[in-house]
């Protein structure tokens, strides 16, 4: 039972990291587009 709680906690941590990283990833993608000569 404890084992599953650990997995759940790790999963939440990973999800939080992805959620907080998403805006940065989007910003990087936009910056690359601009550098490559997009709009």
From Swiss-Prot:
Listed under GO biological process in this entry are: antibacterial humoral response; defense response to fungus; defense response to Gram-negative bacterium; defense response to Gram-positive bacterium; innate immune response; killing of cells of another organism
Induction behaviour: By bacterial infection.
User: Entry's Pfam families?
Assistant: Cecropin
One GO cellular component term, please give it.
Answer: extracellular space
Q: In which tissues is it expressed?
A: Hemolymph.
Q: Where does the record say this protein resides?
A: Secreted
Q: What InterPro entries does the database record attribute to this sequence?
A: Cecropin (IPR000875)
Q: Which UniProt keywords apply?
A: Antibiotic, Antimicrobial, Fungicide, Immunity, Innate immunity, Secreted
Outline what the protein does: Cecropins have lytic and antibacterial activity against several Gram-positive and Gram-negative bacteria. Has antibacterial activity against the Gram-positive bacteria M.luteus (MIC=34.4 uM), L.monocytogenes (MIC=34.4 uM), and S.lutea (MIC=34.4 uM), and the Gram-negative bacterium E.coli D31 (MIC=8.6 uM). Lacks antibacterial activity against the Gram-positive bacterium B.circulans, and the Gram-negative bacteria E.coli ATCC 25922 and S.typhimurium.
Q: Which family does it belong to?
A: Belongs to the cecropin family.
User: Mind telling me what this protein is named?
Assistant: Cecropin-D-like peptide
Q: Which organism is it from?
A: Galleria mellonella
Q: In the record, what lineage is assigned to the organism producing the protein?
A: Eukaryota, Metazoa, Ecdysozoa, Arthropoda, Hexapoda
